Amino acid sequence: MNTKLKILTIADWDAMPHGDGNRYEIIEGELFVSRSPGLTHQIVLSNLIFLIRSHLKTNPIGTIVSNPGLVISNISGVIPDLVFFRKDQRETIVTDDRLTGTPALVVEVVSPGPANIRRDRITKLQLYAAYSIPEYWIVNPGSKTLEKYVNSDSSLILLETLGEDENLTTMAIPGFSCQMREIFNEF
């Protein structure tokens, strides 16, 4: 007997529960469910948001959003930890109060556990590459590192891995820079 898995769509994603403490993501028609992120994850994410928003206050070139629903295709809807889109992208990326399409930068903060690590490092990396996300960061609170990937011909290539004693800059947000240790400050 051959059983075929149903390919899920954005309509299925929209019908899933909200506010139950889980994250529901559909990647190429397959459902991924994860728990809400832990405290360290949230502190690192809050630090990143603060640093980037501080830069954007004096350089209003775009918008940063945490934990948005991002519809990439009819069979892929994800909830990245952070998304940045430029002002000139707003009309094409914001549709009916949701993000659709290709933002300038996507950031995932890795949560502990092999399934989480595999999803951010393999599954989402492949998804973001296939849909031409220009820049993707994987932030690892455990090792206090940030991997910066850039898109080249629908492949995300590891540009650099930064440690806590290094300086972070990005092509996605011109003029932005910070010391990596600022991202990993606990309180």
What do these predicted ranges mean?
Residues 1-187:
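Gly/Pro/Ser/Thr-rich low-complexity, intrinsically disordered segments predominantly at protein N-termini
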